[in-house]
C-alpha cells in the first residue's frame, strides 16, 4: 500500500485536530453535571453513555493523520481503564491539556526532549504528593461513597459496598442484566480460579470475549486430552442432553482441541476447555474441591478411571459458568451440601495444623473459593438503552471501589490534582525543562476547569479560588458549594487519579517528540462500467 508523509509542524497540527475532536466528545461527560454522548450502533439501539473509554473506542476519523491523533488519546483512555478501571475521562482531559500547551511551546521553538524531561519530573513529584495526601478506606460507608461518586448514584454505591462486605474486598463480584426494573444484589455460592479458555473461538460473546455457559455439565480430570476419540462417547451423551460442557483438564491439545473448536463453530455443541488450576499436589486438591462443589467425579488414574469409560453421571453441574481469557467462575455448583461442609471443615483443620505461611495462604484461598461466594449485582432498567448505560456505570463504580481499597482515596472533583499544584511548582528547573514542568502545572487544573464549565460556570474563577483554598476543600459542582470534599464523601481513588495523570503525560510526551507521521493513502474504488446485455436478451 502506498504511504504518505507529513513532517514537523504539519504532522503535529494534523494530529492535534484528531486529539481535539476525540477529547471534546469525551470531556463533556466529566463531573456531576456532565452530559451524555449518544453512540450509533449498527445493528442495535443507540447507546447513551457518559463512560469515557466507551466513547473513545467508537471514534474513527476519516483523515488518517487526525485519526492517529485520536488513537493516541484512545490509548490514554484504554491504559487508564486497564490499570484502574475508571478515570478515563480525567485522563483524556489531562492529555488534551498537556498536548495543547506543549505544542504551543514546540511551535515557539522549545526543544521537545527538554519538555519531556520536565513533564516526567513534574509527574513524578505530583504522584508522590498524591500518595502523601491519600487516606485509607477503612469502612463500608467510605466504600459506598467512592462507588456513589463514580456512578453518580448513591444506590449503586450502596450495592457495591454490601457486595464487598459479603464476599470480601478481593471477592468475586459480577454484574448481570436483570429482566426487571429494579437493581438487586444476590450472593451466590461459587468458585473462581485463574485459568481461562484454551481457544478464543470458544467464546459465546465476542464483544466481551467471554464464554457464558448456562446449566453446563462439568468434566473434571487431571489427564491430558490429546485424542478426540477419548472424549467422543461422553460428548455424544452431552449433545443428546442439549446442554453445554466445561472441560477442566491438565491440558486439551492436538485433535481434541481442534475438534472441540470446529464443532463449537459449526454449532454442533458448546464446549469450553480450560487448564486445571494449580500445580502438582495442589492441582489435585483444587480439582477435588471443584468436583465436590459441582457434584462431579474426578477422572484420574489414582481411582482407576479412564476418559473412554466416563459417563454423564460422572460429570458435575452448575447453574452458570463464565470463562474469560484469564479466569473461570463456577456459580451455584450442584454438589452435595454435606460433602461441601465436610470439605470446608477439613480445610479449616489443615489451616490450623500447617506451620508454613505459604501453605496456610494457599489453603485459605481454597477455603474462600469453596465457602465464600460470588456476589451478583443484577441491573434493572426501564429500557435496553438505559440498562446498558447503567451497567457501564456500575462496572466503572466497582473498579473505582477496588482501586480505592488498594491505594486509598483523595479529594474528588479534580481537587486532589490542584492540591499537588504547590509541590510541583516548587521544582527547581530552567529552560525547556522548566517549561515542561509548567505544562503539567497547567494540566493539573484542567479537570476542575472542565467540571466547572460543564456546570455552566467560569472555570478560571473556580481554579484560582481552589489554588488558594485549604487542602481538601473543593468545589462541589452538584450544589455549587465550597466544601471539605473528604468530609462530605466526594472522593476519588488515588490509583485512578495517579493512573490518569501518568498515562496522559506519557502519551503527551510521545506526541510532542513526534517529528514525522506516515499514513496509508486510502485506495479509491473505481466504479466498474455496467455490462451490456448479451445479444438477443432484453
From Swiss-Prot:
Catalytic activity line of the entry: ATP + H2O + a folded polypeptide = ADP + phosphate + an unfolded polypeptide
Localisation per UniProt entry: Cytoplasm
Record GO terms (molecular function): ATP binding; ATP-dependent protein folding chaperone; isomerase activity; unfolded protein binding
Keyword S-adenosyl-L-methionine: no
Keywords per UniProt: ATP-binding, Chaperone, Cytoplasm, Isomerase, Nucleotide-binding
EC primary class: isomerase
InterPro entries, alphabetized: Chaperonin_Cpn60_CS, Cpn60/GroEL, Cpn60/GroEL/TCP-1, GroEL-like_apical_dom_sf, GROEL-like_equatorial_sf, TCP-1-like_intermed_sf
Record-given protein name: Chaperonin GroEL
Biological source species: Staphylococcus aureus (strain MRSA252)
Lineage summary: Bacteria, Bacillati, Bacillota, Bacilli, Bacillales
Amino acid at each position: 500500500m502506498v504511504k504518505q508523509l507529513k513532517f514537523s509542524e504539519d504532522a503535529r497540527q494534523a494530529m492535534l485536530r484528531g486529539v481535539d475532536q476525540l477529547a471534546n466528545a469525551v470531556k463533556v461527560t466529566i463531573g456531576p453535571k456532565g452530559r451524555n454522548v449518544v453512540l450509533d450502533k449498527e445493528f442495535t439501539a443507540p447507546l447513551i453513555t457518559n463512560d469515557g473509554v466507551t466513547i473513545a473506542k467508537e471514534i474513527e476519523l476519516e483523515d488518517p493523520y487526525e485519526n492517529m491523533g485520536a488513537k493516541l488519546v484512545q490509548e490514554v483512555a484504554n491504559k487508564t481503564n486497564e490499570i484502574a478501571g475508571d478515570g478515563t475521562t480525567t485522563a483524556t482531559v489531562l492529555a488534551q491539556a498537556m498536548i495543547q500547551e506543549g505544542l504551543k511551546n514546540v511551535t515557539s521553538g522549545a526543544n521537545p526532549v527538554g519538555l519531556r524531561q520536565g513533564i516526567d519530573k513534574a509527574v513524578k513529584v505530583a504522584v508522590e504528593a498524591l500518595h502523601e495526601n491519600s487516606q485509607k478506606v477503612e469502612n463500608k460507608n467510605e466504600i459506598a461513597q467512592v462507588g456513589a461518586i463514580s456512578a453518580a448514584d448513591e444506590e449503586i454505591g450502596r450495592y457495591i459496598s454490601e457486595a464487598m462486605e459479603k464476599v470480601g474486598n478481593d471477592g468475586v463480584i459480577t454484574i448481570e442484566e436483570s429482566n426487571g426494573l429494579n437493581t438487586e444484589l444476590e450472593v451466590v455460592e461459587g468458585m473462581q480460579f485463574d485459568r481461562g479458555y484454551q481457544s478464543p473461538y470458544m467464546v459465546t460473546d465476542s464483544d466481551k470475549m467471554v464464554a457464558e455457559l448456562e446449566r453446563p455439565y462439568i468434566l473434571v480430570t487431571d489427564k491430558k486430552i490429546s485424542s478426540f476419540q477419548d472424549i467422543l462417547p461422553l460428548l455424544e451423551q452431552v449433545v443428546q442432553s442439549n446442554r453445554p460442557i466445561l472441560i477442566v483438564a491438565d491440558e486439551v491439545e492436538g485433535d481434541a482441541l481442534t475438534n472441540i473448536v470446529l464443532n463449537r463453530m459449526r454449532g454442533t455443541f458448546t464446549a469450553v476447555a480450560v487448564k486445571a488450576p494449580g500445580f502438582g499436589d495442589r492441582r489435585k486438591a483444587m480439582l477435588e474441591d471443584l468436583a465436590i462443589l459441582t457434584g462431579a467425579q474426578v477422572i484420574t488414574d489414582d481411582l482407576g478411571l479412564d476418559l473412554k469409560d466416563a459417563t454423564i453421571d460422572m460429570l458435575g453441574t452448575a447453574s452458570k459458568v463464565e470463562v474469560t481469557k484469564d479466569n473461570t467462575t463456577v456459580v451455584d455448583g450442584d454438589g452435595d451440601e454435606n460433602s461441601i461442609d465436610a470439605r470446608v471443615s477439613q480445610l479449616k483443620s489443615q489451616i490450623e495444623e500447617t506451620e508454613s505461611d505459604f501453605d496456610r495462604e494457599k489453603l485459605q484461598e481454597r477455603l474462600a473459593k469453596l465457602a465464600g461466594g460470588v456476589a451478583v449485582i443484577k441491573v434493572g432498567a426501564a429500557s435496553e438503552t438505559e440498562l446498558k448505560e447503567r451497567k457501564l456505570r456500575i462496572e466503572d463504580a466497582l473498579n473505582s471501589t477496588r482501586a480505592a481499597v488498594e491505594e486509598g482515596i483523595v479529594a474528588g472533583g479534580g481537587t486532589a490534582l490542584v492540591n499537588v499544584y504547590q509541590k510541583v511548582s516548587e521544582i527547581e528547573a530552567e529552560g525547556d525543562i522548566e517549561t515542561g514542568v509548567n505544562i503539567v502545572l497547567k494540566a493539573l487544573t484542567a479537570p476542575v476547569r472542565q467540571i466547572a464549565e460543564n456546570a455552566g460556570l467560569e472555570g478560571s474563577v473556580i481554579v484560582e479560588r481552589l489554588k488558594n483554598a485549604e487542602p481538601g476543600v473543593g468545589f462541589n459542582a452538584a450544589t455549587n458549594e465550597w466544601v471539605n470534599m473528604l468530609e462530605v464523601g466526594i472522593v476519588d481513588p488515588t490509583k485512578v487519579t495517579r493512573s490518569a495523570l501518568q498515562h496522559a503525560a506519557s502519551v503527551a510526551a510521545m506526541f510532542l517528540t513526534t517529528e514525522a507521521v506516515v499514513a496509508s493513502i486510502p485506495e479509491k474504488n473505481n466504479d466498474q462500467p455496467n455490462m451490456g446485455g448479451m445479444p438477443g436478451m432484453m
